């Protein structure tokens, strides 16, 4: 049987829609793309296991070789939604133009599996003494469901893991986490001509905002990591809405905010800080302040800076490792083994119209993956 080419696999990935979204009208399953990956890797001699994590949401684990340890190459099979009116190309068709591949998922990050496939296809597997694993997860773009499930249930522990998010082939050894909450203040509406008739939710929210800004200053003073370009946690007041008319006492006001904690800050500890910051306001206005998460929190992540794995991958890439501010599945896979983020394409193209991956990444990425397989599986 003739095996599909790198380009065949790349086209197949991009043409198979696998959008995940918190908006049910956009959210899709990823079964079709997982089935394609299953067929392709099985044809290369991998043992393939597909797990339905939730209805319509699947993880794939492909294994080549037996034994303990080995290398895990991981990525997510889903993409974000797209705005058709802002794309110059069909998002679900791989378009080649100006030495670039255009399409949804070319960089972030379904396309990475085509690189793994091609490197594995070219590899001479004689002498392999440790397994190679390929993990394709679901719902990274929303809840990190696939990575959370895999790290909690997998029966094995590889020696090392590489997640193929777009890093321009620069190894990433750490990133901040992400916590996003809603603060909902419930007041009591009434006619503005008599303030005593109601409780103004905007005025209570003013006190909430002051408390959160004080917390922001505390976080900056209390936590510092010089390995990050922005060395402290950030707290951003991102969205606020309250009231419906100038002549009504505001009955409800909502604030959306996020915090990006440094690695090492526990999510429980951060939650205690956030709730502690609002304790006095809540005591003053009992039953009127509610804190609700917008999504499950993601912890910060950092691979031990002097770990041999970092030095080994830096040597393969010829590039020093770095830290970044965006989030990946690394905090969850790091629970299993030392983990780095390394993949083709630029993060600047992620979640953007006309997402693309430059042809310049093709050969270097296949080369780095081939060398990593050889180094950690032989």
Curated annotation (Swiss-Prot):
A family per Pfam: M20_dimer
GO cellular component: cytoplasm
Annotated metabolic or biological route of this protein: Amino-acid biosynthesis; L-arginine biosynthesis; L-ornithine from N(2)-acetyl-L-ornithine (linear): step 1/1
Main location: cytoplasm
Keywords: Amino-acid biosynthesis, Arginine biosynthesis, Cobalt, Cytoplasm, Hydrolase, Metal-binding, Zinc
Coiled coil: none
GO annotation, biological process: L-arginine biosynthetic process
Protein location: Cytoplasm
Entry's EC annotation: 3.5.1.16
InterPro entries xrefs: AcOrn-deacetyl, ArgE/DapE_CS, Bact_exopeptidase_dim_dom, Peptidase_M20, Peptidase_M20_dimer, Peptidase_M20A
Active-site residues, as the UniProt record annotates them: 78, 140
Binding site for Zn(2+) 2: 108, 141, 351
Classification via PROSITE patterns: ARGE_DAPE_CPG2_1, ARGE_DAPE_CPG2_2
The protein's required cofactors: Zn(2+); Co(2+); glutathione
CDD domains, per database record: M20_ArgE
Catalytic activity: N(2)-acetyl-L-ornithine + H2O = L-ornithine + acetate
Residues annotated as binding Zn(2+) 1: 76, 108, 165
Record-level Gene Ontology MF annotations: acetylornithine deacetylase activity; zinc ion binding
Cofactor binding notes: Binds 2 Zn(2+) or Co(2+) ions per subunit.
Homology family: Belongs to the peptidase M20A family. ArgE subfamily.
Quaternary structure note: Homodimer.
This protein's name: Acetylornithine deacetylase
């Amino acid at each position: 049987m003739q095996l599909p080419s790198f380009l065949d696999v790349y086209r197949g990935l991009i043409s198979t829609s696998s959008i995940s979204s918190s908006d049910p009208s956009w959210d899709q399953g990823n079964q079709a793309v997982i089935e394609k990956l299953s067929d392709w890797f099985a044809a290369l001699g991998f043992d393939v296991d597909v797990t339905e994590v939730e209805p319509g949401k699947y993880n794939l684990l492909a294994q080549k070789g037996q034994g303990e340890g080995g290398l895990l190459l991981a990525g997510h099979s889903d993409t974000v939604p797209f705005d058709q009116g802002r794309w110059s190309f069909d998002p679900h068709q791989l378009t080649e133009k100006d030495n670039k591949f255009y399409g949804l998922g070319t960089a972030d990050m379904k396309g990475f599996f085509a690189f793994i496939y091609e490197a594995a296809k070219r590899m001479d597997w004689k002498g392999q003494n440790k397994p190679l694993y390929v993990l394709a997860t679901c719902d990274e773009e929303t809840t990190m469901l696939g990575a959370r499930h895999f790290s909690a249930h997998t029966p094995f522990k590889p020696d090392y893991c590489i997640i193929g998010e777009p890093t321009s082939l620069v190894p990433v050894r750490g990133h901040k986490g992400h916590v996003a909450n809603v603060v909902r203040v419930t007041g009591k509406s009434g006619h503005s001509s008599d303030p005593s008739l109601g409780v103004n939710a905007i005025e209570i929210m003013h006190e909430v905002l002051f408390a959160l800004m004080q917390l922001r200053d505390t976080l900056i003073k209390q936590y510092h990591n010089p390995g990050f370009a922005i060395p402290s946690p950030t707290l951003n007041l991102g969205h606020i809405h309250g009231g419906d008319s100038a002549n009504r006492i505001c009955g409800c006001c909502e604030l959306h905010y996020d915090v990006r904690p440094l690695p090492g800050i526990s999510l429980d500890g951060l939650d205690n800080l956030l709730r502690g910051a609002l304790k006095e306001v809540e005591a003053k206005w009992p039953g009127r302040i509610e804190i609700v998460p917008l999504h499950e929190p993601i912890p910060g992540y950092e691979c031990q800076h002097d770990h041999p794995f970092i030095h080994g991958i830096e040597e393969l890439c010829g590039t020093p490792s770095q830290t970044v501010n965006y989030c990946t599945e690394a905090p969850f896979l790091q629970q299993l083994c030392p983990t780095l983020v390394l993949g083709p394409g630029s993060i600047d193209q992620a979640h953007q119209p006309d997402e693309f991956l430059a042809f310049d990444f093709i050969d270097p990425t296949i080369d780095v993956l081939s060398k990593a397989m050889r180094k950690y599986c032989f």
